[in-house]
Swiss-Prot record:
This is Rootletin. The keyword Coiled coil applies. Major structural component of the ciliary rootlet, a cytoskeletal-like structure in ciliated cells which originates from the basal body at the proximal end of a cilium and extends proximally toward the cell nucleus. Required for cilia integrity and function in sensory neurons. Maintains cilia integrity, partly by modulating the assembly and transport of intraflagellar proteins along the ciliary axoneme. Required for normal mating behavior and normal responses to environmental and chemical stimuli. InterPro entries: Rootletin-like_CC. Keywords: Cell projection, Cilium, Cilium biogenesis/degradation, Coiled coil, Cytoplasm, Cytoskeleton.
Length: 1955
């Protein structure tokens, strides 16, 4: 109602405004008419004046001139008129200047002047708003007839004038009346405007109410969604209760089956005497047992396959999660960079504004200075011109600054939007975490389900055990019955059945022997398997321990990676760079030692070059001393060049200041990065804690496994079953691990789900395809499940202990989950704190931005333009929406076609899979034998590998000790480098220029690092996949690990080489800098002596050539670095080849021999690398011993690895055939199963991703709604501004009118009433208006004739100049146009409000639709997850059999992964080093450029030296002093050079001696090794000697000699080591001395440079005046440059504005699309509600079906009773048979007494009859067994039918959804036609399922329920039991269920009749 009232108010406002317009138009017309009237009056007045003038002239001519005193006495009223009188009328001013005599009442003139001033003051100041109306004072200065009497004494003319004046005043009164009416109209307009403002306020209140209603609707939607969720949970509970009831029915059925088994045992006991039949039964039982065993084997194989598939799928998911995590990190880093960049831009803009303000201040100062310094010759016009120029320039600058401020404001708005997006993203993150918690709850629920299923499985296992025990009892009873039958036959007919008994005995003995042999074989096999399992478990425990150690190594490697990333960041700063490089060098001390050797070689070369250069310096100095007399002119030129250099240094200092500012910014960024790294480290600590808990759980699991082994010893026959249970337990543990990993990865999955809305349709189509694939998979899995259930009936497993273990595991899981939740809460708190801090920072920034925003103008105009653009974009989006709808329809049709194709292909694939499974099951049995042999071999290999691992651990301990030594050495290097830092301080100024490039390169390096991390993760995922494929080839993997270790050594060698090259480059850079200093000195000397001789120029060219040679050397060094990099690339390529070989091992095992040859070649290459390392190690003094030990150890390892390679080659030859067969057979079946299961889980994951995307889209839509609300608020603000403007205009009008009225109504002073003359003070009035400025300069005239002439001229001039009526018209027109503009603005704003309200409504609808779609998708996801859980539960039961034979292989996989992770880390190291090399190359190039620039600048400076010769004569003495000091310094330098040369020579000698010593040491070590071998031989011989000494007592002199030789060799070795240590100390001491001398040289050079600087300062004092002039010129140039830069920046900002507008348009399009999707979601919500109602009906139907199933159960109970009756009759018959047997025995005894032959024949006949009767009983027994089996099958068939029925209903619901979606787009008749199609399709599906159900019921019910027919007359017929049909649509809501059931009953009756 309020919204309707507000719209009516808006309409009323528009109507009122139109009425106001009409009134204003009428007023304007009336004013026009008044103007015409006033013009006529003016014409008449002019005529009257002419007449009055003529008459006055005639009157003066007739009468004499009056005396002054008489005129004063006759006209006493004119005494106050000194000069002028004033008459002001509407559009009329009469100026009559009158010249009065000086004697006329001069006493009154001051009073009159005061009065005039007072009136003028009132007209100007007293009235606040001066009117521009043409109407003057009504009663003031009016020309009355009394005034006219002074002009004419006659009465006739005066009467005419009076009549004209009366008419004129009447018209003037009418004019005033009209003006008063206009004021009333304006007051009316004001009131209407107030009403409009009130209406706008009402509209604003309505808008707030609408927003509240919107919030209420959202809350209602939320409550509805919660209600739907509760209904879903209720529905799930109902289904679970139904499932439980079905399980209870199954239990009852099993109980009935047990009773039947008991009946079977009773019948078996009754038929104990029949020997032959029981033998047949025994054979049949044996066959059945064999068949069951075969089925068990097949089932185990299937379980293994499925378990492998599931494991592969989980690993694939982990890989995808890691990739998603890396992508999310990249996005977060990009966002952080964008924020930083925007902050930098804002800061730059502020700095620019500050600079502009400074420039403006400077300009103002310049203007003042120019004004102050201006001489007297300048005119004020010149000054004004200059000021105008300055003002124009300032205005231009102000405009530019305003534009820049606008751009800054836009950027600020952009930053605000980004902040809002960030806050929204964080809100989404919180929601995602909440959803994760819900997912965790669902997982807990799934775990509970798994527990229930385990309990059910345990119950089933117990039942199966009972059945098996009954079967064993049966077999025992059969054996007892056989024995008893033999005894009875011996008693009955010993004589007649001797042969028969012997044959039976032979058969029994053979059978028993076979059974015993089988039992013994099985027991032996079980014992072997038990021992093997124990070995495997031990190995697995050991491998797990190794795995833990490897995990620790992996963590250490990760920490190393983090340290190296920090090192990359440390390259940004200079001193921090060096310190952090030292930390890295401490970790890589071995590599640094290798680098020092090459550095020394380079130092020697550079020393030689230095000696040559110094010789040349000496020559140059000699030339300088010779040319000092000629160097005066050169010195003057030199001073000029120094002045220029000073200017350059000033510029450099400014640049350095800028660089320092940037460094400060970089430090701030580094601080933020460190905070983030701290946060990351906290996360890592939490992950480490989780791993620790995981390891504790594994320890407890190992304890439980030990208990299980103890239980295995007690139960010998069920070891295999317990192993399967252990596998289940391992799978549960792995699932728990996967859940823990998912906890870490799930937090970052949500960032992948922020995609565009356009992908929604495609995802929906993919979901439908996925559902079809899942259905096919479900059918296959159901078939497998049915097979498993039928086969599990024959098995039995005791799992009571497992239940206890599972309960303990649950407790552990609960504890771990609680800890995980606590950690999550901590993380949330930390994130909230960080968010609060960020918000505070951003709020401060926003406050600053808002302060800047206050100065911005013309914002309203831009908003209006934006609104117009938005309306246009809205229209475009509507058109695109229509097009998208049409495209959507086409895509749906194409999707349906694709579905049909996919279904056909799935059917074909299912058929192929069935065939492949059969073949694979046959070949699997054949491979098991070969696999067992391979397992034994692998166990032996594992033992050997464990020994190798122990050896490697010992080596690692030795390497760690070496690392500690290297750390100490690195500390020494730190001290040395600190000394080097003192020299580096001078280089900081040059490097500050390079920091810009370094920052850019750092950003590139960060990006490269992120890319490398992504590549590393991808490689890790590929490596994991490859390791899965190579799980069987453990021997090959071990071989590859050995190769990888060698590769690591080679990589370390390459890294050391790269570090050496880096150090060389650093030394070359230091040398280059030294050479730069020397070149600076030389250049100065050459600049002084350039004009002297040509020889100097030639030598200068030679020096340039030397510099070029040095540059060439640098290039060569770069080439060397490039070559090393290429070698690294080649190594990486070789590594990739290794990975390819690993993958080819699974497909091409035959090529392993060739690959092994390649690996041998690669090992030789690695051996060469090791030799190079040995050669490099010889150059080191301190670490010679450690490195030699390492080399010997590495050689041993290499030999061992070669031996292992050869052994593994031989092993591969044995394993090759088995794995080839296995690969070819298992490839197809496993790939098919993997693809299906992967596709199913991928589709489920995609569904979840789409759900989260929808949620993110909802969040974006809400953001857009908030933005539109802000826009609505902006529009309200605009309305307020327009209203304020309107009020101002109205106030102006009112003030104008008031001023006009006041000007008319202000009466004249009291003295005017006494005026009776025609003298008017016109000039004063003119001066009040602004006509006569020089009113005081009016001359005094002596005659009245002259006065009248002047008065007529002035009067005409005033009439021509003053046209006030035109100004009033202009103002009214302006007011009219302004009012029209305001009305148009008001109308536009009202339209915009209405549009905004419509958009709000539409978006609310879209939000509701989207929420419904999300709920639907969530339901689908829940359904998919339930199906997935069911599939996983089934698959877990199938996976457990597959993992028994592959536990050892999987434990090996972890080791391989760790090794490959190390490889990846090494690759990252290589890439980092490559990046460092590239960075150093760039720095060298920059240095070359700087050298070239410096040379050019110096050449230019030398050209300008000859200008100022005269100014440098006074400084010659100071130069002479400086030259003397320089000569002294040069002498000192020469001495130091000589000392350095001597030191270098000594070093060379020492190095030669060291090399000789190293050679001797190597020779001695070789001798030591030989001696050790000889000692070992001697020790062996000693043992033999000792044995011989006991017999022969020979002397042991040879032994003593060997001991003495050994001691001698040890002493010599100790002496050599001491010598080595002494030499190393001496070398260190010499190096320290050399460095000290170099420092001294550097100090001397610095002193010389300081003296030169002093000279330059002295010269600079003379050039100060010139610099001031040049500075002013530079200031002008800089000003121009700043203007150009500002303009360029303005252009850039305009471009950015265009880009932002384009982005806004894109966002608007997206918002429009989201609106359309919202509408679709609303429609889907309605459909889902309908579907919910349909599902409720379906639930009711299922309950009815449940009742029917209960009826069927009752009928089965009736059947059971009938079977019990039949069994009772059978028992009676058995009793009768016993009686007959007793009678027959009595008869036989009688007949034997009577007659032997007759009795024999009779007994034979009776025996045959008994056998026939026993056969009939056996057939009846078989029929009963078949009936029971048929009932089991019937129950499974019912279950399948129910599942198919549910599937049918789902398909029907999906079909109805599709058709309804199509029906929404289609028209009325199309809807009806589709409804018919829908009913036809539904009827077709019903008929199809009806036919299926009928066929199934015919085949099951008619074939399985058979009659019991006996051969004799006494066999009663058992009546058939008509079970009710089980149809897929037997509920009340189905179509024609009653008729179909009747039809099925008739057909079943017909089938019975046919039987």
């Amino acid at each position: 109602m309020k919204s309707a009232a507000s719209s009516e108010d808006v309409v009323r406002v528009t109507e009122d405004l139109s009425e106001c317009r009409n009134r204003l138009d009428a007023g304007i017309e009336e004013n026009r008419r008044n103007r015409q009237v006033i013009q006529d009056i003016n014409d008449q007045l002019q005529r009257f004046r002419q007449r009055a003038n003529a008459e006055s002239i005639e009157s003066f001519n007739l009468t004499p001139s009056p005396d002054v005193t008489l005129s004063s006495l006759a006209h006493p009223g004119l005494t106050h008129l000194h000069n002028q009188t004033n008459i002001s009328m509407p559009s009329l001013t009469i100026d009559i200047p009158l010249n009065s005599n000086a004697m006329i009442s001069s006493s009154r003139t001051p009073n009159y002047a005061i009065n005039g001033l007072r009136n003028r003051h009132k007209s100007l100041v007293g009235h606040r708003y001066r009117s521009t109306s043409p109407i003057g004072d009504y009663g003031r200065h009016r020309s009355s007839p009394r005034v006219l009497a002074h002009y004419n004494l006659d009465g006739a003319d005066i009467g005419v004038g009076e009549e004209n004046l009366d008419e004129l005043f009447a018209k003037l009164k009418e004019e005033l009346f009209k003006n008063n009416t206009l004021e009333e109209v304006n007051e009316m307009l004001r009131e209407e405007n107030d009403a409009a403002l009130a209406a706008n306020e009402h509209l604003r209140v309505d808008a707030t109410n609408l927003s509240r209603q919107l919030q209420q609707l959202q809350q209602q939607q939320h409550t509805e969604s919660m209600r739907f969720r509760s209904e879903n949970t209720r529905y799930r509970n109902q289904t679970e209760t139904q499932h439980r009831k079905l399980i209870s029915l199954w239990k009852e059925f099993t109980a009935v089956k047990r009773q039947l088994h008991e009946l079977r045992t009773t019948t078996a006991n009754d038929l104990d005497r029949q020997l032959t039949e029981f033998t047949r039964c025994a054979t049949l039982m044996r066959k059945a047992i064999r068949h069951a065993e075969q089925k068990n084997l097949d089932q185990k194989e299937q379980m293994k396959r499925e378990k492998d598939d599931v494991l592969d799928e989980t690993l694939r998911q982990l890989n995808s999660v890691t990739e998603n995590y890396m992508k999310s990190e990249e996005k977060a880093n990009e966002r952080q960079r964008d924020l930083k960049r925007k902050e930098d831009e804002c800061r730059k803009l502020r700095e620019q504004n500050d600079e502009l303000s400074d420039i403006l201040e400077q300009l103002s100062k310049m203007a003042h200075e120019m004004a102050g310094g201006r001489g007297r010759n300048e005119t004020p016009m010149d000054v004004a011109r200059k000021m105008r120029k300055l003002l124009t320039t300032k205005n231009g600058e102000i405009d530019e600054s305003r534009e820049a401020a606008k751009q800054a404001e836009k950027e600020r708005d952009r930053a605000k939007k980004d902040l809002e997006k960030e806050e929204k993203r964080r809100k989404d993150d919180r929601e995602a975490e909440r959803k994760r918690s819900s997912v965790y709850s669902q997982r807990e629920h799934d775990l509970k389900k798994l527990d229930d299923e385990l309990r059910k499985a345990s119950e089933k296992i117990r039942n199966l055990e009972e059945q098996r025990e009954s079967q064993e009892k049966l077999t025992i009873s059969v054996q007892n019955s056989l024995n008893e039958a033999h005894r009875q036959h011996k008693q009955f007919i010993e004589e007649l059945m001797i042969r028969h008994r012997e044959e039976l005995k032979e058969r029994e003995d053979s059978h028993e022997e076979a059974l015993r042999s089988k039992d013994t074989e099985e027991r032996s096999r079980f014992e072997k398997e038990r021992s093997e399992r124990e070995k495997i478990r031990r190995e697995s425990d050991e491998l797990r321990e190794t795995q833990r150690s490897l995990k620790g190594d992996v963590a250490a490697m990760k920490t190393d990676l983090d340290d190296k990333t920090l090192r990359l960041d440390m390259l940004e700063t200079e001193r921090d760079e060096l310190k952090k490089k030292l930390e890295t060098e401490r970790e890589q001390a071995d590599q640094r030692d290798l680098e020092i050797a090459e550095c020394r070689a380079k130092l020697d070369e550079m020393a030689e070059k230095e000696a040559e250069l110094r010789k040349e310096l000496a020559e140059f100095q000699a030339i300088i001393t010779a040319m000092e007399g000629e160097g005066k002119l050169n010195q003057e030129q030199f001073l000029e060049s120094k002045n220029e250099l000073n200017t350059l240094t000033d510029q450099i200092e400014s640049l350095n200041s800028e660089v320092e500012n940037k460094n400060e910014e970089i430090r701030n960024l580094m601080a933020t990065l460190q905070e983030k790294e701290v946060h990351i480290q906290n996360v890592r600590t939490s992950s480490h804690q989780l791993t620790a808990t995981y390891e504790e759980a594994n320890g407890e699991i190992d304890i439980l496994k030990a208990e299980l082994t103890r239980l295995h010893e007690q139960v010998n026959e069920r070891t295999r079953q317990i192993s399967e249970a252990n596998e289940k337990y391992d799978d549960a543990a792995r699932k728990n691990d996967a859940l823990l990993e998912d906890v870490a990865t799930w937090q970052e999955k949500y960032e992948q789900l922020k995609m565009e809305l356009e992908e929604m349709n495609r995802r929906g189509q993919e979901k439908e395809r996925e559902e079809a694939d899942l259905r096919a998979l479900l059918d296959d899995l159901r078939g497998n499940f049915d097979k498993l259930t039928n086969e599990l009936k024959q098995k039995g497993v005791t799992v009571d202990s497992l239940n206890e273990e599972i309960s303990s595991l649950k407790e552990q899981l609960n504890k771990s989950e609680k800890e995980r939740k606590e950690e999550l809460l901590r993380m949330e708190e930390l994130e909230q704190k960080n968010e609060a801090e960020m918000k505070e920072e951003y709020e401060v920034k926003l406050q600053l931005a808002e302060k800047d925003r206050q100065g911005v103008e013309n914002f309203g105009k831009e908003c209006e333009a934006r609104m117009n653009e938005l309306t246009k974009i809205h229209e475009m989006l509507m058109e695109e929406h229509d097009q998208l709808k049409v495209d959507h329809l086409h895509t749906e049709e194409e999707v349906e076609r694709l579905k049909e194709k996919m279904r056909k292909e799935l059917e074909k694939l299912n058929e192929q899979n069935d065939g492949d499974r059969a073949e694979w099951s046959n070949e699997r049995n054949r491979l098991e034998s070969s696999k067992n042999e391979a397992v034994t071999e692998l166990q032996e290999r594992v033992q050997k590998l464990e020994d190798v691992v122990k050896e490697k651990e010992d080596k690692e301990i030795a390497l760690r000790r070496d690392l500690e030594d290297s750390h100490e050495k690195s500390r020494d290097l730190d001290d040395k480098l600190r000394k080097m830092e003192l020299t580096d301080e001078e280089k900081e100024e040059d490097r500050k220029k390079e920091q810009k490039t370094l920052n850019e390169e750092r950003m590139k390096l960060m990006e490269q690092k992120e890319e490398a991390m992504l590549v590393a993760t991808k490689h890790a995922t590929t490596i994991d996949q490859q390791t899965r494929r190579i799980s069987v080839l453990e021997g090959d993997v071990e071989k590859l690990t050995a190769g990888i270790a060698e590769r690591e050594s080679s990589i370390n060698a390459l890294e050391s080489n790269t570090m050496e090259l880096i150090s060389k480059l650093e030394t070359t850079e230091a040398e280059l800098e030294k050479l730069k200093d020397e070149l600076a000195v030389m250049l100065k000397q050459n600049s002084e002596l350039k004009n002297g001789k040509e020889g100097l120029s030639e030598k200068w060219n030679e020096e340039r050539k030397k510099i070029q040679d040095l540059a060439d050397q640098l290039r060569e060094a770069n080439k060397v670095v490039h070559n090393m990099r290429m070698k690294n690339v080649n190594l990486e390529e070789k590594k990739n080849e290794l990975d390819q070989n690993v993958t080819d091992l699974t497909n091409k095992v035959r090529q392993l021999e060739i690959q092994l040859m390649d690996k041998a070649a690669k090992n030789e290459v690695s051996g060469d690398l090791l030799r190079k390392m040995e050669h490099d190690a010889q150059s080191m003094l301190k670490q010679a011993q450690n490195e030699q030990f390492r080399l010997t150890d590495l050689e041993k390892v290499r030999k061992a690895l070669q031996d292992e390679n050869q052994r593994l080659v031989n092993d591969l030859a044995t394993v090759k055939a088995a794995f080839e067969v296995k690969r070819e057979t298992s490839k197809s079946a496993i790939s098919d199963i993997l693809d299906k299961y992967r596709s199913a889980e991928e589709k489920a994951n995609k569904g979840e991703l789409d759900n989260q995307r929808l949620r993110s889209d909802l969040a974006t839509v809400t953001l857009k709604l908030e933005r539109q609300e802000l826009k609505a608020k902006d529009s309200d603000n605009r309305l307020r501004d327009s209203q304020k403007r309107f009020e101002e205009v109205q106030s102006k009008l009112a003030n104008l009118q008031k001023s006009a009225v006041e000007s008319l109504q202000n009466p004249m002073s009291s003295n005017s009433r006494q005026n009776r003359s025609i003298y008017v003070d016109i000039p004063r009035a003119a001066s009040s208006i602004g006509l006569n400025e020089n009113s005081d300069e009016v001359p005094l005239r002596s005659s009245p004739s002259v006065r009248f002439a002047d008065s007529s001229q002035n009067m005409q001039r005033a009439v021509d100049s003053m046209d006030v009526s035109s100004s009033v018209g202009v103002t009214l027109r302006f007011l009219k146009e302004r009012i029209e503009q305001l009305e148009a603005d008001n109308a536009d704003l009202s339209d915009a409000l209405e549009k905004a309200k419509d958009e709000l409504r539409q978006r609310n609808e879209k939000l509701a639709d989207r929420q419904m779609v999300i709920e639907r998708v969530e339901r689908q996801l829940v359904h998919i997850t339930e199906e997935r859980n069911t599939i996983e539960n089934r698959m877990t039961s199938q996976r457990q059999m597959y993992l028994t034979n592959e536990e050892s292989s999987r434990s090996r996989e972890h080791e391989i992964r760790s090794m490959k992770a190390r490889i990846s880390t090494l690759e990252l190291h290589l890439r980092e080093k490559e990046s460092k090399l590239a960075h150093l190359r760039k720095e060298i190039e920059v240095l070359h450029g700087q050298l070239h620039d410096a040379l050019e600048s110096k050449e230019k400076a030398t050209g300008l030296v000859g200008v100022q010769d005269s100014k440098h004569r006074d400084l010659e003495e100071q130069l002479d002093r400086a030259n003397r000091e320089r000569e002294l310094a040069i002498g000192k330098q020469r001495r130091t050079l000589a000392e350095n040369e001597n030191l270098f020579r000594k070093l060379e000698q020492l190095e030669k001696e060291r090399e000789q010593l190293m050679r001797e040491i190597t020779d001695e070590r070789r001798l030591n090794e030989r001696n050790r071998t000889s000692l070992e031989e001697l020790r062996v011989s000693e043992r033999t000697w000792k044995s011989a000494m006991t017999t022969a007592k020979k002397p042991a002199e040879e032994q003593e000699r060997a001991v003495q030789e050994q001691r001698r060799w040890e002493e010599s070795n100790h002496e050599m080591t001491n010598r080595n240590t002494a030499l190393t100390k001496e070398c260190d001491r010499l190096r320290v001395e050399m460095r000290d001398q170099l420092n001294r040289m550097n100090g001397i050079n610095l002193r010389s440079v300081d003296f030169e600087r002093k000279n330059e300062e002295l010269s600079s004092k003379l050039i100060v005046m010139q610099n001031t002039v040049t500075a002013m010129k530079k200031f002008e140039e800089e000003w121009k440059r700043l203007e150009a830069e500002m303009r360029a920046e303005l252009k850039i900002l305009r471009k950015e504005k265009l880009m932002q507008t384009a982005e806004i348009e894109d966002l608007k399009r997206k918002s429009f699309r989201s609106d359309t999707e919202k509408k679709e979601i609303e429609g889907i919500r309605v459909r889902l509600e309908r579907e919910i109602s349909a599902l409720k009906r379906h639930v009711d139907a299922l309950e009815e079906e449940k009742g029917k199933t209960e009826k069927a159960v009752r009928e089965t109970m009736n059947e059971r009773r009938a079977i019990d009756k039949s069994l009772a009759s059978m028992e009676r018959e058995n009793q009768q048979l016993y009686r007959n047997c007793a009678q027959l025995q009595a008869q036989i005894q009688n007949l034997e007494r009577d007659a032997g032959n007759r009795s024999v024949t009779k007994l034979a006949k009776e025996h045959s009859l008994l056998e026939a009767r026993i056969a009939a009983l056996i057939e009846e027994k078989r029929q009963l067994q078949s009936m029971l089996d048929q009932k089991d099958a019937n129950y499974s068939h019912k279950r399948k039918l129910l599942e198919s029925q549910i599937q049918l209903l789902r398909e029907q619901l999906e079909a109805e959804r599709r058709k309804r979606t199509k029906g929404v787009v289609a028209t009325g008749p199309t809807v009806s036609r589709r409804g018919v199609q829908h009913t036809s399709a539904f009827r077709h599906t019903i008929e199809r399922h009806r036919s299926l159900s009928q066929s199934s019921e015919r085949t099951i019910l008619q074939e399985r329920y058979l009659e019991y027919v006996y051969t004799g007359d006494r066999t009663p017929a058992i009546q058939m039991i008509n079970t009710p049909p089980i149809s897929p649509l037997s509920h009340s809501g189905s179509f024609n269920s009653d008729g179909r059931e009747a039809r099925i009953r008739r057909e079943s009756d017909n089938g019975h009749l046919q039987h």
